[in-house]
From Swiss-Prot:
GO cellular component assignments: cytosol
Cofactor: FAD
Binding locations of NAD(+): 281-295
One BP term from GO: tRNA methylation
Molecular-function annotations in GO: flavin adenine dinucleotide binding
Keywords, sorted A to Z: Cytoplasm, FAD, Flavoprotein, NAD, tRNA processing
Protein name: tRNA uridine 5-carboxymethylaminomethyl modification enzyme MnmG
Family, per entry: Belongs to the MnmG family.
Gene coding for it: mnmG
Length: 657
């Protein structure tokens, strides 16, 4: 049957990538259909019950700045919040939250059901409708054909998925869900380059069988005994602490020599060590057997016992992801302090699945082979809810823009972690599941959590992603930051008018000549609050008083203070950005035959011919392409007078072919 209504965008899959893709396209005005094998699992947290972390929290803030759902859903579902790296510089501070699985899923479902221009339909997709080199729709498992102008594929671990527990294995998309075998076969027919990856999850434990008196309590920020007692962090720029449910602690235990002995005894039945698993696992979230094998000299590993929610006794033991046989899982869990009588509710397992080489994507995440077909999430070789959500939002945006006949939106590496993520995937590809770290960004001082809205909300508004309420809140914050920064720069402190005792109290010593407040705030040991109490509050501002702006005040002050203290570093980084931008604006001819560029080595020619970079900047980041090779390529292009060798538009976006 051909469904009687046509759509602009079809999104296949209802995980973290799919939900953000569907919401983004619908917010932008596209008639959007979200196809999922089970409406009850929309927004499901398939693995760990947490959102955020180093690098990952930055992505969540960026998704939020563009009107996405993940941060707000986390504020509604978060049962513990922490600011990681709080004692370090602002560039690497990151928010992390434990989330109640049921509350999180409910929040996402509510947002989906209440979003205009968005339709939900429960059916697995078995096939794509392709005419020539363009996708025109999707076909479900019972033969319903939906026509659309673009399709965003966010299949997660479902593509030909296989679960392993010991030497036993079976086909599945995740525990309890069937795999997408037909869809995977169809994609292979389209000759899209693919491979296999794997990920894993730990056994779940009944909290009633845990002796918490033998474990170390880990309260969240704002909880009794935690950092900043009484002040619980907030994830969304539109969120507040009143949205949070009841806050609860996590707990810590450790593996020991007995645990490691048990794990080693199961190596001969491990699918990872016996070759049953072909896919490569995530380097930064290894299985416990991998950790014991690789770090044989380490006597103990920290294990975090994380609550799955407020209405369940289920706990997630973060740190013992495993595919070992269940008898080994049973013994290794019970070998740890506090878990001697633990009851396992669900066994741990590994899952391997198909992914498609992201180097075959355009920088909009549209496939090069099939027009209108976009990929996002684990299908691109990434791991993590946050990476998936960011990609889904990005692909949804560009699918909607293509339907409008507009240029793709591609943030640069100096504009967003999303830009770093996209560029890394399409230029470097993956050899293992990719996760985000702050260390992946060259310009991370500019890419902080606190300024994600300043970097992206304006672009989101222009594309139709940001509603009036968010835009009004953002505009008030932006204007307040600007006004207060200017006030500090134009307010001068004269040593003749400042009592020495006050100067010593706030500044550490008397001043010898006139300074403006902004320059005084640049001093490492001078805080904003102390500065505004100087000389009886004479230098305080009404514009950012807590009485005037309420909760908006803290973010405003934070922005102003960071801008002052890191002004020199930020300015130097901006200079680096400008130098790098030259290459990013130079587009490479689409039809260039790199094998004919005689000045380049065979290796470089082969890599450029395979990857087909869109800009000189992308070419420079391909592994093995040296700065000398880039210089030679520039000479070749200039001598040849190639028409395509021209600057991109000033806003850094590219034309969708």
């Amino acid at each position: 049957m051909l469904y009687p209504q046509d759509f602009d965008v079809i999104v296949v899959g209802g995980g973290h990538a799919g939900t953000e893709a569907a919401l983004a396209a619908a917010r932008m005005g596209s008639r959007t259909l979200l196809l999922t094998h089970n409406i009850e699992t929309l927004g499901q947290m398939s693995c760990n019950p947490s959102i955020g972390g180093i690098g990952k929290g930055h992505l969540v803030k960026e998704v939020d700045a563009l009107g996405g759902a993940m941060a707000l859903a986390t504020d509604e579902a978060g049962i513990q919040f922490r600011i990681l790296n709080s004692s370090k510089g602002p560039a690497v501070r990151a928010t992390r939250a434990q989330a109640d699985r049921i509350l999180y899923k409910a929040a996402i479902r509510r947002m989906l059901e209440n979003q205009p221009n968005l339709w939900l339909f429960q059916q697995a997709v078995d096939d794509l409708m392709v005419e020539g080199d363009r996708v025109v729709g999707a076909v479900t498992q019972v033969g319903i054909r939906f026509r659309s102008r673009a399709v965003v594929l966010t299949a997660g671990t479902f593509l030909d998925g296989k679960i392993h527990v010991g030497l036993n294995n079976y086909a599945a998309g995740r525990a309890g869900d069937p795999p997408a075998v037909s869809l995977s076969a169809r994609l292979k027919e389209l000759q899209l380059p693919q491979g296999r990856l794997k990920t894993g999850t730990p056994p779940r434990i009944d909290g009633r069988s845990i002796d918490f008196s033998q474990c170390e309590e880990q309260p969240g920020d704002g909880m009794p005994g935690g950092v900043n007692e009484g002040a619980v962090p907030v994830f969304s720029f539109m969120g507040n602490a009143a949205m949070h449910p009841r806050q609860v602690p996590c707990w810590i235990t450790h593996t020991n020599a007995r645990t490691h002995e048990i794990i080693r005894s199961g190596f001969d039945r491990s699918p990872m060590f016996t070759g049953k698993i072909e896919g490569v696992g995530p380097r930064y979230c290894p299985s416990v057997e991998d950790k014991i094998n690789r770090f044989a000299d380490k006597e103990s590993h920290q294990i975090f016992l994380e609550p799955e929610g407020l209405t369940t006794h289920e706990f997630y033991p973060n740190g013992i992801s495993t595919s070992l046989p269940f008898d080994i899982q049973y013994d290794l869990v019970r070998s740890m302090r506090g878990l001697e009588n633990a009851h396992i509710l669900r066994p741990g397992y590994a899952i391997e699945y198909d992914y498609f080489d992201p180097r075959s994507l355009k920088s909009s995440f549209e496939t090069r082979q099939i027009q209108g077909l976009f990929f996002a999430g684990q299908i691109n070789g990434t791991t993590g809810y946050e990476e998936a959500a960011a990609q889904g939002l990005f692909a949804g945006i560009n699918a909607a823009l293509q339907c409008r006949g507009e240029r793709a939106w591609v943030p640069a590496r100096d504009e967003a972690y999303l830009g770093v993520l996209v560029d890394d995937l399409i230029t470097k590809g993956v050899t293992e599941p990719y996760r985000m770290f702050t260390s992946r960004a060259e310009f991370r001082l500019q890419l902080r959590e606190d300024n994600a809205d300043m970097r992206l909300t304006d672009a989101g508004r222009r594309m139709g992603l940001v509603d009036d309420a968010r835009w009004d809140a953002f505009s008030r914050k932006r204007d307040a930051v600007s006004r207060e920064t200017e006030r500090l720069k134009s307010t001068w402190v004269n040593p003749r008018n400042l009592p020495t005792v006050e100067a010593e109290r706030v500044l550490g010593k008397a001043i010898e000549h006139e300074y403006n407040l902004f320059d005084l705030l640049r001093r490492p040991d001078v805080g904003y609050d102390a500065l505004t109490t100087m000389d009886g509050g004479k230098y305080a501002s009404e514009a950012v008083s807590r009485e005037t702006l309420g909760e908006l005040s803290a973010p405003v002050i934070e922005q102003v203070e960071i801008a002052a203290k890191y002004a020199g570093y930020i300015e130097r980084q901006r200079d680096e950005v400008q130098r790098a931008a030259h290459f990013e604006k130079l587009r490479l001819p689409e039809d260039l035959d790199y094998m004919q560029v005689a000045a380049l080595s065979i290796e470089v020619r082969q890599k450029l011919q395979k990857h087909r970079p869109e800009t000189l900047g992308q070419a420079s980041r391909i592994s093995g392409v040296t700065p000398a090779a880039i210089s030679l390529l520039m000479v070749h292009l200039k001598k040849g007078g190639f028409k395509g060798f021209a600057p991109q538009p000033a806003d850094g976006v590219e034309t969708v072919a």
